[in-house]
Amino acid sequence: HERYLFEQIKEAYYAKDRQTQMLLIPLLIGLSTKEMNIVRENIDMFENAGFILEEFGDNTYKVSGVSNVGYNIDHKSMFKDMITELSTTEKTERQEKEHRFLATLACKAAVKGGMKLDVEEQKRLVDNMIGLDNPFTCPHGRPTAIPMTRYEIERKFMRK
């Protein structure tokens, strides 16, 4: 799911097709001076990803809209994680910085282990993955599937 979301987010980001979900109650997120500067320096990345932000006092951002990806997301935590990712890529080339920023957004919005999906959601997830150019790794490089031989499968199900 993370890989599929990443490809969708990346396509919308570079097409400047902002996918924003307005929040009924805006988030007020307190930040350190360093974090405030990171957001200021990268405000275009947040906006292109669908966030609607404005400074709200000395060390606070008001978030009125968020990237419209995933569900059951803690937007405050996601926002802070994206700032943390940007803080580790300060001297990185713009394209790599954007890749890591979008990968973090996809990671935070993706279905996680232990989440329950109904049959339709499971089918849609598999169909979406099959249609990708690179369905075999998440944007961070971790595998999305593990190949197994017939023998390994039979052994797991105690047939051998």
For each of these PLM feature ranges, what is it?
Residues H1-K160:
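Long, charged low-complexity intrinsically disordered regions
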